Design a protein with these regions (language model features):
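N-terminal accessory targeting/assembly segments
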Residues: 1-107
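Helix-rich effector regions associated with P-loop NTPase G domains
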Residues: 11, 37-55, 67-87, 123-124, ...
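Conserved beta-strand/loop subsegment of P-loop NTPase cores
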Residues: 90-98, 121-131, 153-158
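Catalytic P-loop NTPase motifs of RecA-like helicase/translocase cores
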Residues: 104, 134-135, 165, 239-242
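Histidine-anchored nucleotide/phosphate-binding helix
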Residues: 108-123
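Canonical P-loop GTPase G-domain recognition
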Residues: 133-187
Length: 314
């Protein structure tokens, strides 16, 4: 039988067939997939082949094959820096939720996420949430950031999960697609999903005052069928986002505004640091490229995993 993985709890996987039958499945032995050293061999969104077995009137499945993934979102595991974690696979688009405060989402985090999405060919839409709570100065920050990312080619939408602002617009973009929702803990993912589909009634928790971060309410990624011909993958809140092994020469290719200028650089292997006649550095000097983007690029290039969490708005 063939089905799609809707939920992973580490050892058991919830798999739904095209007929809508749900099986609890596990894997036997070790799965090695394309040399990906991931902590989870099977991810939500995977299409798998499995066989059923019945013991004591309980039917479960054993997964024996994973179909090739069209794409996936992957990040470094928090505890095992050399290992990776596949958050979800076979995604049509990702909605990355961003909040300016309560908790703050820094540009370094946004850019790391976007680089990974570009590398694995996943379309990303930026949702600026909680705009009903912002004063004019904070709204100016939203407008500035939206301008930076729209200029590069990303869709940016200001929303409020609480008031419903632009929720219908987001729903219209989801029809007929598998959409993953991601972002820091506390940015309002569960509240947004509940606004999109109230019957799901996902748990929400308030922001931790001490750390200005949300309490984790989603422990594992999970896919849901929605009433308007759409599927959603809700993911755990992410604190940091480590970019997975990329050659230094290729990182710039996943910054679309850098890639567009690459041919104009004097050297075809230009890293855009201190090489002469670098088109990217010239564009930066003329304010055609945002400094925050260039700073993120340098941090990824240097393998800097920590400082991006504390950078300032500039």
């Amino acid at each position: 039988m063939t089905g799609t993985v809707y939920k992973s709890t580490g050892s058991w996987y919830t798999v739904k067939t095209s007929l809508g039958t749900v099986y609890q499945c596990r894997i036997k032995g070790k799965f090695r997939i394309q040399d990906i050293k991931s902590t989870n061999p099977v991810a939500v969104g995977d299409v798998v082949d499995f066989e059923t077995e019945t013991v004591d009137n309980e039917t479960t499945g054993i997964i024996h094959h994973i179909h090739d993934r069209e794409n996936y979102i992957i990040r470094k595991s928090v505890n095992l820096s050399k290992q990776t974690h596949i958050i979800a696979s076979n995604i049509d688009q990702v909605f990355l939720l961003i909040t300016i405060n309560n908790p703050p989402t820094f540009t370094g985090f946004i850019d790391r996420f976007l680089v990974t999405a570009e590398a694995y060919d996943v379309k990303t839409v930026l949702l600026f949430n909680k705009i009903d709570t912002y004063d004019e100065e904070t709204l100016d920050e939203v407008r500035f950031l939206a301008h930076v990312y729209r200029k590069i080619g990303y869709d940016c939408i200001g929303i409020s999960a609480k008031t419903g602002k632009n929720i219908e617009k987001v729903k219209a973009m989801m029809v007929g697609k598998i959409s993953m929702f991601s972002g820091h803990s506390g940015v309002g993912k569960s509240t947004l999903v509940n606004a999109i589909e109230p019957s799901l009634d996902l748990k929400t928790k308030e922001i931790s005052e001490q750390h200005m971060q949300g309490q984790h309410t989603t422990t594992f990624a999970e896919m849901f069928d929605l009433s308007f011909n759409a599927r959603i993958i809700d993911t755990p809140g992410i604190k940091g986002f480590g970019v997975v092994d990329m050659d230094k020469e290729e990182i710039g290719d996943y910054f679309p505004e850098f890639f567009a200028l690459k041919q104009q650089c004097k050297f075809n292997n230009c890293l855009h640091i201190d090489e002469p006649k670098c088109a990217v550095k010239e564009a930066l000097d003329h304010n055609e490229i945002a400094f925050s983007r260039y700073r993120s690029y340098l941090q990824i290039l240097e393998g800097d995993e920590e400082t991006y969490r504390t950078d300032n708005w500039e």
